[in-house]
Structures are given as structure tokens and as C-alpha cells.
Regions:
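Flexible loop/hinge segments that line or gate small-molecule binding clefts
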Residues: 106-145
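Hydrophobic membrane-insertion alpha-helices, especially the h-region
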Residues: 9-23
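Short beta-strand segments enriched in small/hydrophobic residues
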Residues: 26-55, 65, 72, 136-137
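Periplasmic-binding protein-like
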Residues: 92-103, 122-126
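Short, Lys/Arg-rich N-terminal segment immediately upstream of the first membrane anchor
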Residues: 1-5
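Structural motif
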Residues: 71-93
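Short, surface-exposed alpha-helical segments at coil->helix boundaries
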Residues: 49-60, 81, 85, 144
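Residue-level recognition of beta-strand->loop/alpha-helix junctions
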Residues: 72-76, 102, 127
């Protein structure tokens, strides 16, 4: 049952990230012909954790399918909110078309994500979200139903 749920989550993530990439792609394509630039900031990159590995692979597959560039940056520890915020700041400086993020904190990243949005960067929440609704898209399971 758990494996089935992981595969289902993986499939849903791929589809939704692909939809986000496609939507941004077609919007930006009208402006000019170029590859989209995406930065995905998960809570952690851990090769022993199937969940995070699946999410990252799904995002990379969707980016490849839609001819987008994706970079994955993550803090060393899953609960390293400060490290994740530094990566958000770095991403804002890079000015990608979108930041895909699995926020480690419900409140601690709000101001930075608002700043990114004000800079014209699209925001997609993957697996978790923040108190402020700054996102263009949220991809998550209902943990109470699951």
C-alpha cells in the first residue's frame, strides 16, 4: 500500500510539475523563444529517502520533457530553515522563471517568497506550503486523507 501511494504521489507530482512548466513555458514563449529557468529547493537531497528522490526525479523529468533548465538546491538537513532561506535568497538573485519549493517552515520563508513574487518569479509549492499564499501552484497530498 505504501509503495502504491509513493508511486501515485510520484505520478501526480510529475503531472502537476509538468503542467506548471508547460503553463509558464507557453506564457513565456509568447514573449520570446528561450528555455525556462527553474530552481527546485526541496527540504533536503537524500539519496536514501525515496520520497525526496522521487520528487526531484519527477521535477527533472518534467523539465526535460518541456525543454526547461532545472537546478536543484537543498540544505544539508531537512529541518534547516535558515539554510533553505539562504537558498531562496540566492534563487531570487538568479532571477529564474520559477522557484519550486518544499518549504521547511510554515512561516519562516514567507517574506522571502513574497519578495520573489514581487520580482516576477513564479512560485510552486511542492509537498508543503507556507502561511502566506504567494504560490501560483501547490502540489501536495492531503496527509489527513492519506
Amino acid at each position: 500500500m505504501k509503495k502504491h501511494r509513493k508511486l501515485l504521489t510520484f505520478g501526480v507530482v510529475i503531472c502537476l510539475v509538468a503542467g506548471l512548466v508547460a503553463g509558464i513555458f507557453y506564457y513565456k514563449q509568447a514573449e520570446e523563444e528561450r528555455r525556462l529557468s527553474l530552481i527546485y529547493i526541496p527540504k533536503v537531497v537524500d539519496g536514501t529517502n525515496d520520497f525526496w528522490t522521487s520528487l526531484i526525479q519527477g521535477a527533472e523529468m518534467a523539465a526535460k520533457e518541456y525543454n526547461a533548465d532545472i537546478r536543484v538546491w537543498a540544505p544539508e538537513e531537512e529541518n534547516d530553515v535558515e539554510g533553505q532561506n539562504k537558498l531562496i535568497e540566492r534563487a531570487i538573485e538568479e532571477k529564474p522563471d520559477a522557484i519550486l519549493i518544499s518549504p521547511s517552515s510554515f512561516t519562516e520563508s514567507d517574506q522571502l517568497l513574497k519578495k520573489a513574487k514581487e520580482e516576477g518569479i513564479h512560485i510552486a509549492f511542492i509537498d508543503s506550503y507556507t502561511q502566506e499564499e504567494v504560490q501560483d501552484l501547490t502540489v501536495a497530498t492531503d496527509n489527513l486523507e492519506a
